[in-house]
C-alpha cells in the first residue's frame, strides 16, 4: 500500500481515538448537537480503523512467518512458506477493502433529487417513451421505498409526456440515480406505424440533487420574475379555478422552472424555488465535473445531458448502456422498475475508476 495511504490511515486512527475520548466527555454528552456530530463521525471511521488494525496484525504475522523461512528445521520452513502465502493473499484483500473505504464520498449521494425527463427527437413516439421512462423510475422508486412527487407535467397528444418534472425523496436517491442523466434512445415500431418499420426516438433525462437549505445558492429576489397561471389539469374536480401554478424565471441565467401540481400557490412557489436552486447549483458544478471527467477520461460521471448513454431496443428486448459496453436482454424487466441491473454496473465502474485514480 502507498505510503500516503498508510499515513492517512494513521491520521484517521488518531482521530478515532480522539472521538472515543470525546464521546465519553460529560460536556459533549450534554451538548446533543456535538454528540450527534461526533457519533456520526465515529460510526464512519470505525470500520476503517478496524480494517487498518487487522491489516497491521496480518503484516506482523507475515514478518514473523518470513523470519521462520530461515529456520534450520525443514518442517518449520515448510509451515512458514504456507503462512507467508496465506498472509500475502489476505493482505491483498485487506488493502483493497481499505482503499475502497478511503474513496472520496460524494456529499450529494444521500440527497433527494429532481428528475427531469424531456421528449427529444421523434415527436409523439418520443413523448410516449418519456412516459415509459418515468414509469420505470417510479416503479424503481417504489421498490426502494422512495416517494415520487410530480411537480410539473406537459402531456403528449398520444400519451406520455413532452416534459415531466418530479421530486424523488428517500434514502440515497442521488447516489443511485446520478448516472441516469443523458440522452436515452428507443428503437421500436410505434403504435401508429402501419408498415411495421422501426423508428428511433430519444429523450433526455436530468437528475439534480436537491440542495440542503443551509447550502442552497443565495438567490437575489430582484433577479427573479414570478408569473402565476392556472394549472393545466386533466379535468374533473381537481382542475384549479385560481392562478395557483407558478413559473419562476432567473433573469441573469434565463433559467425557467414551473410547478403546477399543488393546489396551493404557496406550496408551488416553495417547490419551484427549491428546484430553481438545484438547477443553478447544477450549472455551477457541471463545468467543474466535466473538466475532471475530461482530464481523467472517466467512462461515467460527466453527466453531459447531450451524451447518448443508453439504447432500448424493443425488437431485440435489449438494453445497452454505451458508457460501459453493458448489454442486457431483459428490457421488459428493466422498464418494469428493474433498472438496478443497469445502475449497479455503472456504480461499480465508477468506483473502479476512482481506485485507479488513487493509484496514479
UniProtKB/Swiss-Prot annotation:
Keyword Protein biosynthesis in record: yes
GO CC field: cytoplasm
Function: Peptide chain release factor 1 directs the termination of translation in response to the peptide chain termination codons UAG and UAA.
N5-methylglutamine modification, residue list: 237
Similarity remark: Belongs to the prokaryotic/mitochondrial release factor family.
Post-translational modification as stated in the protein's UniProt record: Methylated by PrmC. Methylation increases the termination efficiency of RF1.
Organism: Pseudomonas fluorescens (strain Pf0-1)
Entry GO MF terms: translation release factor activity, codon specific
Cross-referenced HAMAP family: Rel_fac_1 (MF_00093)
Record's keyword annotation contains Glycosyltransferase: no
Localisation: Cytoplasm
Protein name: Peptide chain release factor 1
Superkingdom of this protein's organism: Bacteria
Main location class: cytoplasm
UniProt keywords, alphabetically: Cytoplasm, Methylation, Protein biosynthesis
Amino acid at each position: 500500500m502507498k505510503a500516503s495511504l498508510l499515513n492517512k490511515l494513521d491520521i484517521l486512527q488518531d482521530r478515532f481515538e480522539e472521538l472515543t475520548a470525546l464521546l465519553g466527555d460529560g460536556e459533549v454528552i450534554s451538548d446533543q448537537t456535538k454528540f450527534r456530530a461526533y457519533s456520526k463521525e465515529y460510526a464512519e471511521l470505525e470500520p476503517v480503523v478496524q480494517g487498518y488494525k487487522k491489516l497491521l496484525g496480518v503484516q506482523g504475522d507475515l514478518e514473523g512467518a518470513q523470519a521462520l523461512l530461515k529456520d534450520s528445521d525443514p518442517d518449520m520452513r515448510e509451515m512458514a512458506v504456507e503462512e507467508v502465502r496465506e498472509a500475502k493473499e489476505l493482505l491483498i484483500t485487506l488493502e483493497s477493502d481499505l482503499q475502497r473505504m478511503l474513496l472520496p464520498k460524494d456529499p450529494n449521494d444521500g440527497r433527494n433529487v429532481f428528475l427531469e425527463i424531456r421528449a427529444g427527437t421523434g415527436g409523439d413516439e418520443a413523448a410516449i417513451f418519456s412516459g415509459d421512462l418515468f414509469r420505470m423510475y417510479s416503479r424503481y422508486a417504489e421498490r426502494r421505498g422512495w416517494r415520487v412527487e410530480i411537480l410539473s407535467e406537459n402531456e403528449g397528444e398520444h400519451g406520455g409526456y413532452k416534459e415531466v418534472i418530479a421530486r424523488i425523496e428517500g434514502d440515497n436517491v442521488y447516489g443511485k440515480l446520478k448516472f441516469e442523466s443523458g440522452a436515452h434512445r428507443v428503437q421500436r415500431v410505434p403504435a401508429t406505424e402501419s408498415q411495421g418499420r422501426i423508428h428511433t426516438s430519444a429523450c433526455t433525462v436530468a437528475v439534480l440533487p436537491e440542495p440542503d437549505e443551509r447550502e442552497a445558492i443565495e438567490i437575489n429576489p430582484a433577479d427573479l420574475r414570478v408569473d402565476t397561471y392556472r394549472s393545466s389539469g386533466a379535468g374533473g374536480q381537481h382542475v384549479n379555478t385560481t392562478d395557483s401554478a407558478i413559473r419562476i424565471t432567473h433573469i441573469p441565467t434565463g433559467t425557467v422552472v414551473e410547478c403546477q401540481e399543488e393546489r396551493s400557490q404557496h406550496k408551488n412557489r416553495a417547490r419551484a424555488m427549491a428546484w430553481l436552486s438545484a438547477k443553478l447549483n447544477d450549472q455551477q458544478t457541471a463545468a467543474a465535473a466535466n473538466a475532471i471527467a475530461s482530464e481523467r477520461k472517466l467512462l461515467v460521471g460527466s453527466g453531459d445531458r447531450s451524451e447518448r448513454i443508453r439504447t432500448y431496443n424493443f425488437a431485440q428486448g435489449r438494453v445497452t448502456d454505451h458508457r460501459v459496453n453493458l448489454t442486457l436482454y431483459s428490457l421488459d424487466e428493466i422498464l418494469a422498475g428493474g433498472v438496478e441491473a443497469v445502475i449497479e454496473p455503472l456504480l461499480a465502474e465508477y468506483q473502479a475508476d476512482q481506485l485507479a485514480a488513487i493509484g496514479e
